[in-house]
A protein has these predicted regions:
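Sec/Tat signal peptide C-region and signal peptidase I cleavage site
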Residues: 55-59
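Short, Lys/Arg-enriched N-terminal segments with co-localized hydrophobic residues
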Residues: 15-18, 22-33
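Bacterial N-terminal signal peptides that target proteins for export
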Residues: 35-45
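Bacterial N-terminal signal peptides
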Residues: 45-54
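A cross-kingdom marker for long, charged
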Residues: 60-375
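Cationic, low-complexity basic patches in intrinsically disordered or flexible, solvent-exposed regions
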Residues: 5
Length: 375
């Protein structure tokens, strides 16, 4: 039926590919010319449909990749290990069993990396990597490496180190039905829900201590962009906007951190309706530091949702409005919208607020993928 809409036969595949590429580029630019012939107008519309289908195929491919990685990991475990790593998808106790604290202070369930052999451990990290973007996985690695530094520079303190991270799977890995991957330990809690072609990364906690270190001769700031982009946005505000954004009181820690599932908070600060286009673009760029941790297909869908919400999004700041060059800010900030809460909270433990930070990323309407329905 669709092909018969044209006033001539559907062209062979190579021409279709060229046509889709040509007209999808015009569509992305918003340069549709409605004065063209009816056949070509229909082609543009069809190109948009097919471009959307291409994005859907990419998401399906990502899901298949994650499922394959999960099944590969499970195949390398013995029966006792599989019993330890697998939970029911609706296990609320396991969903909420995450924290910013070391595992010696808040126990995790699942399988610890220390209990895996080299092959199993590589498969576990391949599963985590498959669900994340390259930059997202790099952040995870940098957070874990920072914890290893806490161990080695603290006299091999058994509270810290890259062995003390846990992985669990909630539900059965599926390309259609919902299931979850959890990975975390000190300063890290990833809750990744996969439901068909959709992916959800909330709630997720990322933190860093040290927030600045040297590894193999390179300077590493695991959450440096989260600091720098926020300060750049603050500095882009005019005096009146800053007065609204900067709160008149001190916020010292995460408000909606671990143990706060299902709760919310009144938006504060500067609403993005009072920002200009450039400032709103900077706000979205800041948000992307969290939204883009997950794999690209899911991140693209998430950013589209957050862009649609941007005018209803708030930016609030509490604390010093400057930072030393190359170091993180020592102020708390929050970004909040209809489907979003981001918090950035420097920590006093360690003495230098720029060297210890906790961040939180939530979707109050869809944490743990609760808002997803399977088609």
């Amino acid at each position: 039926m669709l092909f018969q809409l044209f006033d001539h036969p559907w062209p062979p595949f190579p021409f279709v590919s060229v046509m889709i590429l040509r007209y999808s580029l015009y569509a992305v630019k918003g340069e549709l010319d409605m004065s063209v012939s009816p056949g070509r107008t229909i082609r543009v519309g069809l190109a948009l449909v097919l471009v959307g289908s291409t994005l859907s195929v990419a998401a399906q491919t990502a899901t298949a990749r994650i499922v394959t990685a999960a099944n590969t990991f499970l195949s390398k475990l013995d029966e006792k290990q599989r019993q330890s790593v697998l939970f029911a998808f609706d296990d609320e106790k396991q969903r909420a069993r995450w924290s910013n604290l070391p595992v010696s202070m808040v126990a995790r369930a699942g399988l610890g990396l220390k209990d895996l052999n080299a092959d199993q451990r590589a498969a576990a990290m391949a599963l985590v990597s498959s669900a994340l973007s390259p930059r997202g996985f790099e952040k995870v690695e940098q957070i874990v490496e920072g914890d290893e530094l806490l161990k080695t520079k603290g006299g091999n303190n058994p509270m810290f180190g890259k062995d003390l991270y846990f992985i669990s799977i909630l539900g059965k890995p599926s390309e259609r039905l919902p299931w979850m991957v959890q990975f975390g330990g000190h300063h890290l809690a990833l809750n990744i829900t996969i439901a068909g072609e959709r992916g959800v990364l909330t709630p997720t906690l990322t933190g860093a201590q040290p927030a600045l270190y040297t590894l193999d001769g390179k300077t590493v700031r695991p959450l440096g962009q989260e600091s720098d982009k926020a300060l750049a946005l603050l500095n882009a505000l005019d005096e009146g906007q800053r007065k609204q954004a900067v709160l008149g009181f001190q916020t010292a820690d995460l408000v909606l951190g671990p143990g706060q599932d299902g709760k919310t908070i009144q938006p504060e600060g500067l609403k993005a309706t009072a920002m200009n286009d450039k400032q709103r673009a900077m706000l979205l760029d800041l948000i992307s530091e969290w939204a883009n941790i997950i794999h690209e297909s899911a991140a693209g869908a998430r950013m589209a949702e957050l862009k649609a919400d941007v005018r209803e999004t708030w930016f609030a700041w509490s604390g010093p409005t400057t930072a030393d060059p190359g170091k993180n800010i020592t102020a708390y900030y929050r970004v909040q919208g209809p489907h979003l809460v981001i918090e950035y909270a420097p920590q006093k433990l360690g003495g230098d607020l720029s060297m210890h930070v906790h961040t939180m990323y939530r979707d109050p309407t869809n944490d743990y993928g609760r808002g997803l329905t399977v088609k």
